[in-house]
C-alpha cells in the first residue's frame, strides 16, 4: 500500500510569517497575555452595541386609525461619564476569562502542532483480491518519452528538500492508460469509489495515473472529490437549522491526490460537472442523469469553496507569489468612480467596516455606497448617520429588520407592482375625506416604518405625522389602526420603493457585518458547547445568514472574533461557512491581523467571504507592514492565516508603534468637556498625515464632491474622566516604560512574579482615606498581572483596542499624561479618519470605537472586493499583493494633510 499525501486537515504550508520579535520594540514579557485578555474584552464589549434589550417605552393604548396617541419614541438612559471607583463584576470577570482563554490557546497550539492529519489511504478491496483475476494493467505501457514528459517527478531524481509533512514521491518503472480490477476495465479520467477504512464512507476520486512502481507494485493515483462532510464543514452538514441543507449528491473537486495500490478500487461512479450558472431546468435534468455532481472545488487553504475554471477542473496554484499588483496605478482613482454597487451593513456599529470597505473599493475603481445600515445601539446609529448622511440607518434588532423586509416586499407587491391596486385610489381618497369625529386627528403623512420593537407586539408599524402638530408629536401606529388611510399607506410605500428606503431581494450587491456571538464568551458560565446555536446569545449568526438567504446579495463579508473557530470545535465558524456553501455561494475564510495593515494594534479577527457563482470570489490582501503573527488556530483552520510564508521575503513597511499614531495630538486634562478643538500643530509621521486627510482626499464620497462638516478640526479628543481616587493613583504612576501599580509605594514583587505587600511599609492612603493600591489590583490574575494602572509607551503596540477605558485591569494610561487614552487616540488605533465624528456619552463613544472593525483592514478588503466585482481579480490564488502605493494613498494627495495652523494653542476649544 502506498504512502499517502497530506490530507486536507493537515497543515502543508506555513500559515504565517513567524520570527522572533525584538525586545526593544515590544515588551514581550506581557504582550501575549495582554492580547488574549484584550481580545476577550473585545468579544464581551460587542454586547453593548449589537444586542440586548432597550428600556421599554411607557405602555400605550391602541386607538382607531386617525386618532392621535401619546409619543412612543424609544429613549436610552445616558450613563455618567466618570470612571467607577472600583471594577464592576464584568471587569473582575476578565481575569477568569483571560485564564480560560490562555488555556484554550495552549490547547489549540498543541493540537495544531501535534495532531496528525487524516490521510486518504485506500484499503485493499477484499472482493478484488479474492477474485479469479488479480488486478492488472492492460494494454501496452505509455511510451517512455511521453511518460517522462507527463509525469517527470516519477522518473527524475528528487533534488528539492522534502518538507516534514510532505509525502515522498513514488518512483515509476512505466505508466499505463488502463487497468482491470475485478473484471472491470478502468481508464484514465474515470471516477471511482475507493475503499476507505473501517466504518468510513468510501472515498471518491478521479483516476489521473496508472503506474508500476520501482518496487514492482501496481499503483493508481486519484484526485479526490470531497463530500460536504469530508470538508472543514464536516459535522455541521446535518444540523437542524431552517434553510440549512446540503444536497447529499453534491461533491467538491480538490487538488488533493494520493497514490494507492490498484486493488483499492471498488467500482465506477458517474459524476458530472454542473455549471452553477446554467439554466435551472437543464441543471436539474443533468443532475438527475448521474450518481453525483460537482459545481465547485474545495481547497484546505483558506477553507475555499470556489467555481471551477473549466469542465476538467484545471485550476491554478494556491500560492501568493503569482498574484501581484505592482503595475496598478492608483493615481487614476482620485476622482469619483463611475461604476457603483450597493452595501448593507448589518450590526454596523458606528460604521468602521462599511467605511473601510467603501474607501478601499474606491481605490479599485468601484463606488461602493452604504445604502442601508442596521444596529441596535442608537448612539452608534447616530454616529453612522452623521458621517454617512445618504445612508438609511435603522436602529433596530436584526431579526426585526428581516421581518420588516419580508413585510415590505408584500406592501410593494400590493401598492407598486400590482397595477390593479391603483384602481381603488379614488375610493380610498373619498373614504379618507369623510367627516371627522371631534376626538379624531388627521394623518398628514407617514414618515417611517418598522416591525415591532420596544414594547410593541410584532407587526408593521408606521410613524405618523399628524396634521397641525410638530415632529415631536409623531407616533408609531400599527397598520391595523390605519385601515381608514389606505391612500396614505400607498403614497408612503410608492415613495419608499422609489427611494429604496428598504432593500428588496436583488437590490443589495454586498452585505457586510459582524453578528455578535456572546454565547461563546467566558463571561457566559453556562455556555452550550454541544449545540451553541440553541443559545439565544448566538442566534444572531443564524439571523445574519437568514438575511443573506433572503436578499441574495452578490457578495457577503462576515467578521467575527477568532473564538468562533475555537469554541466547541469551531462550531460557529463552520456553521457560517456551511450556510454559504449550502446556499451555493463560493466561500473562503481567513484570519487577519490589524497591525499588518498599518496600525499599532495586533487585533486578530476572522473574515469570511461569500460570492455568488456568477461573480469572482474575492481574495485576501497580503500584509503591507512587518508584524509578527502570533497565536495558533485549530487544526481544521491551520491554513487560514493571511500572511506570507516564512520562506518568502516581501518588502514590507516597518511595523507602526503608538507614537507613530498619536504623538501629534495636543495635551488634554483628565476632564476635557469639549469635543471639538484645534490640532495645535502639524502631523509628525506619515500615518498622522494620512489620518488627517479630508474626506475628498481619502476618497470618501459620503458628502458627494463637497467637504463634510468639521473638516480640519480635532474631534472627540476626550478621555474618560477618572474619579478622584483613580486620578490620584494615575498621577503617582511613574512616567516611564512599563510602569504600573507595582511601582506604587507599599508593593513589592515576590516569588513567581506575584505581587505582595511590603511588610516594612505602612499601607499608603489617598486623600479620601482609601488605599493607594486597591485590593483588586493585587489579586488580579492571582497577583501576576502587570495590567492594573499600566502606562503605555511610545515604542509599543496595543494588543487590542477594547470598549472600556477604565485603568483598573488594562494598560491604557497615556505615556506622559495623567489620564487614559482619549476617544480620538483609540479611534486612531482603529484607523478611523480624524474627520469621523462620534456621538453619545463618552463611555458610549469608547464602545463604538472598540466594537468597530479596524478601518485599514476593511479598506484592504474593500480593494480586493472592488477588484473582484469589476472582474479584475483573476486566478484561483486566495491571496493578493496590494499595490506599493496602497499604504500611502489617497493617490496623488497622499502627503497632503489639512492640519490646523501651527500657531493655534494646543487644546483650544472651537465653539460651534
Swiss-Prot record:
Basic and acidic residues compositional bias, start-end: 21-30
BAH domain boundaries: 184-309
EC number per UniProt: 2.1.1.37
Primary localisation category: nucleus
Gene Ontology CC entries for this record: nucleus
Biased composition (Polar residues): 312-324
Active-site annotation: 517
Span of domain Chromo: 441-504
Keywords: Chromatin regulator, DNA-binding, Methyltransferase, Nucleus, S-adenosyl-L-methionine, Transcription, Transcription regulation, Transferase
Start-end of Basic residues biased regions: 43-69
PROSITE patterns named in the record: BAH, C5_MTASE_1, CHROMO_2, SAM_MT_C5
GO molecular-function term, one example from the UniProt record: chromatin binding
Protein name listed in UniProt: DNA (cytosine-5)-methyltransferase 1
Subcellular location: Nucleus
Assigned protein family: Belongs to the class I-like SAM-binding methyltransferase superfamily. C5-methyltransferase family.
GO process annotations (BP): methylation; negative regulation of gene expression via chromosomal CpG island methylation
Pfam families recorded: BAH, Chromo, DNA_methylase
InterPro entries documented for this protein: BAH_dom, BAH_sf, C5-Methyltransferase, C5_DNA_meth_AS, C5_MeTfrase, Chromo-like_dom_sf, Chromo/chromo_shadow_dom, Chromo_domain
Residue ranges constituting the SAM-dependent MTase C5-type domain according to the UniProt record: 341-872
Chain positions covered by the region annotation Disordered: 1-104, 148-169, 312-334, 890-912
Catalyses which reaction(s): a 2'-deoxycytidine in DNA + S-adenosyl-L-methionine = a 5-methyl-2'-deoxycytidine in DNA + S-adenosyl-L-homocysteine + H(+)
Annotated Acidic residues bias: 78-104
Coiled-coil zones: none
Amino acid at each position: 500500500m502506498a504512502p499517502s499525501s497530506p490530507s486536507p486537515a493537515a497543515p502543508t504550508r506555513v500559515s504565517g510569517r513567524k520570527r522572533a520579535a525584538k525586545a526593544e520594540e515590544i515588551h514581550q514579557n506581557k504582550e501575549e497575555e495582554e492580547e488574549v485578555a484584550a481580545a476577550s474584552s473585545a468579544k464581551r464589549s460587542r454586547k453593548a452595541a449589537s444586542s440586548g434589550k432597550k428600556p421599554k417605552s411607557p405602555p400605550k393604548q391602541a386607538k382607531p386609525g386617525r386618532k392621535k396617541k401619546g409619543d412612543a419614541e424609544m429613549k436610552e438612559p445616558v450613563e455618567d461619564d466618570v470612571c467607577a471607583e472600583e471594577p464592576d463584576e464584568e471587569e473582575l470577570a476578565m481575569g477568569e476569562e483571560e485564564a480560560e482563554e490562555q488555556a484554550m490557546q495552549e490547547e489549540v497550539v498543541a493540537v495544531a502542532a501535534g495532531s496528525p492529519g487524516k490521510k486518504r489511504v485506500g484499503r485493499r478491496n477484499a472482493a478484488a483480491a479474492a477474485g479469479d483475476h488479480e488486478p492488472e494493467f492492460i494494454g501496452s505501457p505509455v511510451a517512455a518519452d511521453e511518460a517522462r514528459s507527463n509525469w517527470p517527478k516519477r522518473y527524475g531524481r528528487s533534488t528539492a528538500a522534502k518538507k516534514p509533512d510532505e509525502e515522498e514521491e513514488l518512483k515509476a518503472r512505466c505508466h499505463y492508460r488502463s487497468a482491470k480490477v475485478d473484471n472491470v476495465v478502468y481508464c484514465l479520467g474515470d471516477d471511482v469509489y475507493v475503499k476507505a477504512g473501517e466504518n468510513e464512507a468510501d472515498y471518491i476520486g478521479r483516476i489521473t495515473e496508472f503506474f508500476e512502481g520501482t518496487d514492482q507494485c501496481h499503483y493508481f493515483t486519484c484526485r479526490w472529490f470531497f463530500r460536504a462532510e469530508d470538508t472543514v464543514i464536516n459535522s455541521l452538514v446535518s444540523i437542524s437549522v431552517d434553510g440549512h441543507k446540503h444536497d447529499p449528491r453534491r461533491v467538491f473537486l480538490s487538488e488533493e491526490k494520493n497514490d494507492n495500490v490498484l486493488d483499492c478500487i471498488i467500482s465506477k461512479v458517474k459524476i458530472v460537472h454542473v455549471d452553477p450558472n446554467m439554466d435551472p431546468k437543464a441543471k436539474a435534468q443533468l443532475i438527475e442523469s448521474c450518481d453525483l455532481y460537482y459545481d465547485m472545488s474545495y481547497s484546505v487553504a483558506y477553507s475555499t469553496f470556489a467555481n471551477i475554471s473549466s469542465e476538467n477542473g484545471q485550476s491554478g496554484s494556491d500560492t501568493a507569489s503569482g498574484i501581484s499588483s505592482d503595475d496598478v496605478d492608483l493615481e487614476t482613482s482620485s476622482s469619483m468612480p463611475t461604476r457603483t454597487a450597493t452595501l448593507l451593513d448589518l450590526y454596523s456599529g458606528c460604521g468602521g467596516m462599511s467605511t473601510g470597505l467603501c474607501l478601499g473599493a474606491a481605490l479599485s475603481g468601484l463606488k461602493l455606497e452604504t445604502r442601508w445600515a442596521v444596529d441596535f445601539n442608537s448612539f452608534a446609529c447616530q454616529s453612522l448617520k452623521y458621517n454617512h448622511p445618504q445612508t438609511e440607518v435603522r436602529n433596530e434588532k436584526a431579526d426585526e429588520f428581516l421581518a420588516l423586509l419580508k413585510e415590505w416586499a408584500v406592501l410593494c407587491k400590493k401598492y407598486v407592482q400590482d397595477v390593479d391596486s391603483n384602481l381603488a385610489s379614488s375610493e380610498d381618497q373619498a373614504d379618507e375625506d369623510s367627516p371627522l369625529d371631534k376626538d379624531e386627528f388627521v394623518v398628514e403623512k407617514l414618515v417611517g416604518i418598522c416591525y415591532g420593537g420596544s414594547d410593541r407586539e410584532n407587526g408593521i408599524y408606521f410613524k405618523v405625522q399628524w396634521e397641525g402638530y410638530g415632529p415631536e408629536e409623531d407616533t408609531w401606529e400599527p397598520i391595523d389602526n390605519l385601515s381608514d388611510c389606505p391612500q396614505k399607506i400607498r403614497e408612503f410605500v410608492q415613495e419608499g420603493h422609489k427611494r429604496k428606503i428598504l432593500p428588496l431581494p436583488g437590490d443589495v450587491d454586498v452585505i457586510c457585518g459582524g453578528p455578535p456571538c456572546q454565547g461563546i464568551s467566558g463571561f457566559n458560565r453556562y455556555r452550550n458547547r454541544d449545540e451553541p446555536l440553541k443559545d439565544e446569545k448566538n442566534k444572531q449568526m443564524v439571523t445574519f445568514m437568514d438575511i443573506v438567504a433572503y436578499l441574495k446579495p452578490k457578495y457577503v463579508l462576515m467578521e467575527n472574533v477568532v473564538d468562533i473557530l475555537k469554541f466547541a470545535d469551531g462550531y460557529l465558524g463552520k456553521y457560517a461557512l456551511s450556510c454559504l456553501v449550502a446556499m451555493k455561494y463560493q466561500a473562503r475564510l481567513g484570519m487577519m491581523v490589524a497591525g499588518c495593515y498599518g496600525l499599532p494594534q495586533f487585533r486578530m479577527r476572522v473574515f469570511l467571504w461569500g460570492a455568488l457563482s456568477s461573480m469572482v470570489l474575492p481574495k485576501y490582501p497580503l500584509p503591507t507592514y512587518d508584524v509578527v503573527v502570533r497565536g495558533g488556530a485549530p487544526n481544521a483552520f491551520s491554513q487560514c492565516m493571511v500572511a506570507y510564508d516564512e520562506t518568502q521575503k516581501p518588502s514590507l513597511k516597518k511595523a507602526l508603534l503608538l507614537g507613530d499614531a498619536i504623538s501629534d495630538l495636543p495635551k488634554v486634562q483628565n476632564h476635557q468637556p469639549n469635543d471639538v478643538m484645534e490640532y495645535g500643530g502639524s502631523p509628525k509621521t506619515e500615518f498622522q498625515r494620512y489620518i488627517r486627510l479630508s474626506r475628498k482626499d481619502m476618497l470618501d464620497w459620503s458628502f458627494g464632491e463637497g467637504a463634510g462638516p468639521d473638516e480640519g478640526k480635532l474631534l472627540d479628543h476626550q478621555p474618560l474622566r477618572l474619579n478622584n481616587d483613580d486620578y490620584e493613583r494615575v498621577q503617582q504612576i511613574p512616567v516611564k516604560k512599563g510602569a504600573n501599580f507595582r511601582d506604587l509605594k507599599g508593593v513589592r514583587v515576590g516569588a513567581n512574579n506575584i505581587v505582595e505587600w511590603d511588610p516594612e511599609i505602612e499601607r499608603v492612603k489617598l486623600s479620601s482615606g482609601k488605599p493607594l493600591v486597591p485590593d483588586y489590583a493585587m489579586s488580579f490574575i492571582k497577583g501576576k498581572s502587570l495590567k492594573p494602572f499600566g502606562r503605555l509607551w511610545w515604542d509599543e503596540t496595543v494588543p487590542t483596542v477594547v470598549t472600556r477605558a477604565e485603568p483598573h485591569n488594562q494598560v491604557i494610561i497615556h505615556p506622559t499624561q495623567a489620564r487614559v487614552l482619549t476617544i480620538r487616540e483609540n479611534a486612531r488605533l482603529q484607523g478611523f479618519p480624524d474627520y469621523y465624528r462620534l456621538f453619545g456619552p463618552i463611555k458610549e463613544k469608547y464602545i463604538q470605537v472598540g466594537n468597530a472593525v479596524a478601518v485599514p483592514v476593511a479598506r484592504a478588503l474593500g480593494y480586493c472586493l472592488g477588484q473582484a466585482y469589476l472582474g479584475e481579480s483573476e486566478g484561483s490564488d486566495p491571496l493578493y499583493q496590494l499595490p506599493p502605493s496602497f499604504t500611502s494613498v489617497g493617490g496623488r494627495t497622499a502627503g497632503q494633510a489639512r492640519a490646523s495652523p501651527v500657531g493655534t494653542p494646543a487644546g483650544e476649544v472651537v465653539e460651534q
